[in-house]
Design a protein with these regions (language model features):
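Venus flytrap/periplasmic-binding-protein-like
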Residues: 1-30
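Detector for Asparagine
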Residues: 8, 21-24, 40, 85, ...
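Structural signal for conserved beta-strand scaffold positions within catalytic alpha/beta enzyme cores
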Residues: 14, 34-35, 98
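Hydrophobic alpha-helical segments within soluble ligand-binding/sensing domains
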Residues: 17-21, 37-57
Length: 124
């Protein structure tokens, strides 16, 4: 038996902070989204590839050596390959984006621009 009475508030969330999700947040149709900057994902990928090509040991120390200015965690337990081997991963910490922090989280860093109506558009 459900306790849903039809008048409960349903939270709608999203991932990736794409333009449609952000418009829904501005319009009050969606509560939040999580965002990871593609540029930061590219930086991690490039630094990881450079370290591998140099023959460096790939571990958590890459985070400190690289001097990234964003949060990243090294995870050796959560993911496995199809044959069951652990797959160490560098995971960017996502930013929770709501109507209250659109400007601070996405516009101020230069990821998005905001038009006169308050809607966000990719900066590049």
């Amino acid at each position: 038996e459900s306790d849903y009475a039809g008048d409960n508030t349903v939270l709608i969330t999203g991932q990736d902070g794409d333009e449609a999700n952000l418009a829904n947040i501005v319009d009050g149709k969606q509560s939040m989204t999580v965002y990871k900057a593609v540029a930061n994902e590219a930086v991690v990928t490039l630094d990881l590839a450079k370290a591998m090509l140099a023959g460096d040991t790939i571990d958590e120390s890459l985070i400190e050596k690289s001097g990234w200015d964003f949060e990243c965690a090294y995870d050796t337990e959560s993911y496995e390959t199809s044959d069951g081997n652990k797959c160490p991963s560098f995971l960017l910490v996502p930013t929770v984006v709501t109507k209250d922090n659109l400007q601070e989280a996405l516009v101020d860093p230069g990821y998005y621009t905001m038009d006169d109506d308050g809607y966000l558009h990719p900066a590049n």
